[in-house]
């Protein structure tokens, strides 16, 4: 499984990329691999304010449906409608296929997430 440096990871297998006050959120390579071929993606409304642990969206595959959670408090600025039109983009490039771009409400919440080396260890225990 690919784990990229420079991202933050949640125990629910979401990744967070920080750029200034904005974050990009998606699901990890492990998550997409576990789900299999993704056939449907549901995203939140632009303007939604979500707290850490809230459902950000839904990803469905031929095997299962899975909620995607926001690992940090956010206000959704943009959604990636390309994923709605072609959900398989997540399978092909999970780290390039962000689900939302959002305003990060509390940067200190990033400290509760894992960095790449911690996430790799976490995956070994899964």
From Swiss-Prot:
Instruction: Establish whether keyword NADP is in the entry.
Output: no
Enumerate the spans annotated as Lipoyl-binding domain.
Answer: 22-103
Question: Which cofactors, by name?
Answer: (R)-lipoate
Gene Ontology CC, one term: glycine cleavage complex
Highest taxon above the source species: Bacteria
Record Gene3D superfamilies = 2.40.50.100
Question: Is the keyword Cell inner membrane in the record?
Answer: no
Q: Which InterPro entries match?
A: Biotin_lipoyl (IPR000089), GCV_H (IPR002930), GCV_H/Fam206 (IPR033753), GCV_H_sub (IPR017453), Single_hybrid_motif (IPR011053)
Cofactor binding annotation: Binds 1 lipoyl cofactor covalently.
Gene Ontology biological process terms from the UniProt entry: glycine decarboxylation via glycine cleavage system
Residues with PTM N6-lipoyllysine: 63
Q: Could you list this entry's UniProt keywords, alphabetically sorted.
A: Lipoyl
> Which family does the record assign?
Belongs to the GcvH family.
Q: How does it assemble?
A: The glycine cleavage system is composed of four proteins: P, T, L and H.
Known function: The glycine cleavage system catalyzes the degradation of glycine. The H protein shuttles the methylamine group of glycine from the P protein to the T protein.
Query: Which PANTHER family would you find in this protein's record?
Result: GLYCINE CLEAVAGE SYSTEM H PROTEIN, GLYCINE CLEAVAGE SYSTEM H PROTEIN-RELATED
- Protein name (database record): Glycine cleavage system H protein 2
Organism, as annotated: Caldanaerobacter subterraneus subsp. tengcongensis (strain DSM 15242 / JCM 11007 / NBRC 100824 / MB4)
Q: Which gene encodes it?
A: gcvH2
